[in-house]
């Protein structure tokens, strides 16, 4: 795969998205960060501010997302809604999805990042999660998570990848991102 053809889709937020962007930049990978007016982000390379019509294209029912992820979202949470809409763009544009976070007992991923993982499942896209608490990569097989053995981390095989995850990035999560880019590019 020619890295000049590759694009990382992310959101530019502090934590995992910042680390994905930094790794992409170090490896000469183009970067697109989806955001919205007024959103606090730290990565501005490849910034794509979505307008109200574009955000509406990625709109999802907070009730549906809440049921899917066993969580409650209030309908009057415009910032949460916009964040979920930008995550829709990240996953929709990526052919392969990489997430840094925590897989919960119900199989969902904790936090807003979880919507990205669930949407990737719905879209049947290759999905890999680095669970910081378990210090391991997991790959979604269509029905459950398969734990990857140490030394068998995923390798990007598509030119359009999505990198997202927790704001609370731990050193092992950062290393997982760096190692992913080293293996892939």
Regions found by a protein language model. Give the residues of each.
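Acidic/glycine-enriched connector segments
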Residues: 2-185
């Amino acid at each position: 795969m020619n890295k000049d053809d590759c694009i990382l889709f992310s959101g530019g937020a502090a934590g995992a998205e910042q680390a994905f962007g930094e790794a992409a930049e170090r490896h000469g990978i183009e970067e697109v960060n989806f955001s919205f007016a007024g959103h606090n982000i730290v990565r501005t390379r490849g910034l794509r501010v979505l307008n109200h019509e574009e955000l509406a294209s990625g709109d999802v029912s907070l009730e549906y997302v809440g049921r899917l992820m066993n969580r409650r979202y209030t309908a009057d949470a415009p910032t949460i809604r916009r964040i979920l809409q930008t995550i829709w763009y990240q996953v929709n544009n990526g052919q392969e999805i990489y997430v840094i976070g925590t897989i919960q007992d119900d199989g969902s991923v904790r936090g807003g990042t979880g919507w990205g993982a669930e949407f990737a499942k719905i879209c049947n896209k290759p999905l890999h999660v680095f669970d910081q608490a378990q210090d391991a990569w997991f790959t979604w097989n269509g029905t459950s998570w398969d734990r990857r053995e140490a030394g068998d981390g995923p390798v990007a095989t598509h030119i359009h990848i999505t990198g997202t995850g927790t704001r609370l990035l731990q050193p092992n999560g950062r290393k997982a991102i760096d190692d992913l880019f080293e293996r892939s590019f």
